[in-house]
Amino acid sequence: HPELAESLMIAKQFLYLKHLTFEGARRRYGELNEQILKRLDYELSTIEWMGFPGYFLIVWDFIRAARELGVSVGPGRGSAAGSVVAYSLGITNIDPIKYDLLFERFLNPDRISLPDVDVDFDEDGRADVLHYVVEKYGSKRVAQIITFGTMAPKAAIKDVARVQKLPLSESNRISKLVPEKPGTTFEKAFKEAPELLAERESENPLIRATMKYAEQLEGSVRQTGVHACGVIIGQDDLEKFAPIAIAKDAELNVVHSV
């Protein structure tokens, strides 16, 4: 039965995680006092209940491999620094007991959310870590994440103007009317720049057409790219769950939305 098989898998993962955690905790703290034991028991039971033993094992494994490969690894950022389990595993290098950091900011049984460990590798060593992950899990189960660049008003005007063969001077003049603010849409731009709105009713038919088609193209995908950091590891071939592409400059396959 699939659900039983998954439960057994999580149980095995948890036993190994628990073993590694206590092994690491003894290296970090020496003798484990009542405070540390209580904290470890609470964190491990939360991780088991939320079904994340496998996640911790994967992160532990590639960080361990990175250090063995001589790759510089950051001390850990964000809420993961509040986990004694993560500290014991060597995922982070900040002692949550010493600095009184809260585990609940990382994982909270009352607020179901995915764990997020921010891991930093040196720029030169990142490729070595990726290579290790691909070798371990297989190239069909590891992929980077595609990104989509969409048409903003300024770019839409310039692209349409070029196709419409509108003179470059006019194209530049109109596009400069768009406010230089992040997240600007045509709707917002028309409110802030009435002179841009007036171009819709221009006496020049090429300008009217340019404005019309630029508005229609706003938000359309203009180009694709690869996420700077994100990597997906699947328990099965990723093509079973999402479309896969081969990016020109990517080190791996890239996956569309999952």
Annotate each PLM feature.
Residues H1-V258:
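Alpha-helical scaffold/interaction cores of sigma-54-like transcription cofactors
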